[in-house]
A protein has these predicted regions:
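Non-catalytic substrate-recognition and accessory regions of acyl/acetyltransferase enzymes
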Residues: 1-63, 74-166
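Glycine-rich phosphate-binding loop
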Residues: 66-68
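Hydrophobic positions on the alpha1 helix immediately C-terminal to the Walker A/P-loop
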Residues: 71
Length: 166
């Protein structure tokens, strides 16, 4: 896991964008000239860190069942209450930087299929408590932990899927 610390000698943009384009995009959504934009300032006041879940990969047989949101929540629960957790609900590209040497068996998707899957991913993540901080945000954020927990959600999921198989 990468960690970035601002010692005050660089602008936040340089720190975010210099690390990865993903963090640069989060900066563009949350900051203007190194200050939180007013639309998110009240929501984020008091948080110390931004944790970015860059990718979640499920085996094909587990996709489309709402497990991605539960897994994202379980990851978020590993961090402190002073951390805001962010992710972007978008399917991974088989040729993208998160799939070096084609390690993961990812399908090639049309633009329409990507948008359809992104909507499903967003619904799964929002079902686990993630939300956009403002209309038009491409990222979803978890700013505090709500009930149910990831464990409670997986127990519910398991019960629902046992009934389907029975």
């Amino acid at each position: 896991m990468d960690q970035i610390i601002n010692d005050g000698t660089c602008s936040l943009f340089d720190i975010f964008d210099g690390h990865s384009s993903d963090l640069g995009h989060i900066y563009e959504e949350l900051f203007d000239d190194d200050e939180l934009i007013p639309a998110v300032e009240d929501e984020l006041l008091g948080y110390e860190n931004i944790v970015l879940i860059k990718s979640i990969i499920l085996k094909p047989e587990y996709r489309g069942q709402g497990l991605g949101g539960i897994l994202a929540l379980a990851i978020a629960e590993l961090f402190g209450e002073q951390d805001i957790v962010a992710l972007k609900p978008w399917p991974m590209n088989p040729d993208g930087p998160d799939n070096p040497a084609g390690v993961w068996d990812l399908p090639r998707l049309t633009e329409t299929a990507q948008k359809t899957i992104a909507k499903k991913l967003g619904k799964s993540y929002m079902g686990a408590g993630f939300k956009p901080l403002f209309k038009g945000s491409s990222h979803l954020f978890l700013t505090h932990y709500r009930n149910p927990t990831a464990t409670q959600l997986i127990d519910t999921w398991h019960k629902e899927h046992q009934n389907v198989k029975a």
